Amino acid sequence: LYYCLTNMQEAIYSTKKGGGVPHVHISDIDNFEIPVPPVDVQSKIVEILDCFSSLEAELEAELEKRKRQYVYYRDMLLNFSDRKDVDWLTVNDVFEMRNGYTPSKSNRQFWEGGTIPWFRMDDIRANGRILSDSILHITDKGVKGKGLFEANTFILATSATIGEHALLTTDSLANQRFTNLKIKETLIQKLDLKFVFYYFFVIDDFCKHHSNKSGFESVDMDALRKMPYPIPALEEQRRIVGVLDKFESLTESLAAGLPAEIIARRKQYEYYRDKLLTFKRKEETAP
């Protein structure tokens, strides 16, 4: 019965009507017909469809397992708490910090024909954590204060969707949900940019655990500025980056392949479900 109703879902949804939030009326689906083949046939169909469902669930579990493995090893490599060969500063010692902002939407001169990337959380969701261009752009007239965020700096979500970051590979700006962090000139030669990128995952987690939840959620910026920041030897930073780059490449390869396999299995499942749950009426099969 479950598989039968799942197969009828589209037809059921097509009866939705009403103002506001459309919904399905029982009276509209009372006359929907459900085939009742012999119980042994039902059992065989369920066995086949259960097999397809199980295969899809196994693939999804494997994908989730690979992601957890990557996070585990990344966190292990970035944990310096027991290391005596690492110098420690604070986030405030390491970075210059600036707030993002949104130019007035009512002023067309700030937006029309703009070519300057202006990042929002949507850009990270759509294009990942290394950003070279944005969905929306502003003009130079929309830029104020100290100018653009420089290439090879970072944006960190410090309000709303807290604990997300990205590396900017071009001069740009971001909205007020982000704080821009630029490595201080005195530390440029002591920090590998990709190591800093990976260590932002630790900062992300710190932000999620140090936020003001009253009203509009935002990061406790005083706590963030005081957060300890490790400076391992440059050679060690590059070793960690090499390991994480390889692990990430492998994970991404699997993450790209497994969803495709899941989609293929789902299509296969839907094909056989439709075939197995399509029955001729008795009068159609009568001699």
Region locations from a protein language model:
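Non-catalytic DNA-recognition/assembly elements of restriction-modification systems
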Residues: 80-101, 261, 272
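Sequence-specific dsDNA recognition surfaces
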Residues: 94-107, 122-151
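Amphipathic alpha-helical segments
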Residues: 30-67, 71, 86, 228-266
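A short beta-sheet element
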Residues: 1-6, 120-121, 137-147, 151-201
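Intrinsic low-complexity tandem-repeat regions in disordered proteins
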Residues: 2, 9, 45, 67-70, ...
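Long compositionally biased, domain-poor regions of proteins
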Residues: 6-11, 16, 38, 128, ...
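A short glycine-rich beta-alpha junction/loop motif
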Residues: 20-37, 173-181, 213-232
